[in-house]
Amino acid sequence: MSKCAKRVLVFSDLHANKRALLDIAPVLKKVDLSIFCGDLLGYGNDIDYCINFVLENVDLIVLGDHERMAITHENLDGQLPEVRASTIYTRCKLSPKQKELLLSLPTEIWHENLYITHSINDEYLRNKEDFERLCEKMRGGTRYAFFGHTHEQVLYRHNERIVLNPGSITKGRRGFPRSYALIHGDNIEFVNLEGIF
């Protein structure tokens, strides 16, 4: 399987936070391919700015669970109070055009030797068994699987396949910093960001 010949930026879990997005905006100009692994919305108030910026400047974008909850009006009874509150707020703020644009986003992308998703059935993928399930979804020549959702950095190698979660550029969880990932050739680097939003 071929290595990644392009300079690739992988980031996830922006959650409508303009300040976090501005941290990586300069990086977008220095890469050949930019990938966003979902959760553009939720928690933050910078909905319009983040939707416009990501849709205009990022090459490959998948739908996250926070976008899906905001545009499909699914039942929120099982969600945490802060998730319910932010989803209801987001539903009120989205325009019909924005909802249409978000509805057009796929939940999975296969691009060259890459597989991109936010998660599998909204599960938190955190262990070897979870990562191997992602590998099972990878098609023939696919080498990389990128996902988000947990806000935690993951780099897992299995039979020449690589599973990567770049973490969250807004807020890390379980001791992880805010971060994104850069890939060039065989080099994979997590870039940690300062500050908590």
Where on the chain are the PLM-derived regions?
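Short, glycine/charged-enriched secondary-structure capping and boundary segments
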Residues: D23-V27, Y49-N52, N75-G78, D130-F131, ...
